[in-house]
């Protein structure tokens, strides 16, 4: 379970970096703002998840070294939606941790909405 959690946390922290790159390179003000809200928010909620997990199950001992830099923000956020949905079942089922995963999913979903539909 710890390996699944460390991959989950690492992927989400990498998403902050990736969306920061998109934030800097977009020509759209609405996308610029949505991506900025995302990378600020995802670090905070990922940190909350990691600390809650470690408080209950112990410290992480390793993290994956793989890093992927995506090319297109909407497709990337949609892939994060699928990642969180798939990973959820392999993560601890404690309600407090699942609630934090809900917050993560909510942030990804609202950012995807803003990128797709707000101009």
Question: Across the structure, where does each feature detected by a protein language model lie?
Answer:
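Amphipathic alpha-helical coiled-coil segments
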Residues: 48-53, 111-119
